Amino acid sequence: MALDESITSRDYLYGRLLAVAEYIERTALDAAGEKRPTNAERLMQRFADHPCDTWRQIELQLSPYEQRLQGSSRAGLLFRARKTLDAIMNQFQGDDFKAPGKLSGEFLLGYHCQLTSLYSKSGDDTPKENP
């Protein structure tokens, strides 16, 4: 299944957010030659159980990686990724973003579809492997 930007379910949107965060951090780590799991990867289980609180943590942790990209030849990539994050956030309906409750498996669909889309648009459809 390809990315469907018209899907506005809470779980799908949260998965998409996680994918964009993963993409930003992975791009910055790869550019620096660092081989380690991203915060999005490390916090995926917690994210599935407590998405709103965990998203806050993940987004705040993106700042140093965004700064790395901003001062590099990949600043355009960062601009597009931030624009995508903003567009996804704008799709949440009412109180869905802060609604309590775990995410269903649908968040994984949103995550993988968004990640595939990001890597195919960047021309690098083979993300680096983690250790």
Q: Would you name each region that the model predicts?
A:
Residues 1-131:
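Intrinsic-disorder/low-complexity detector
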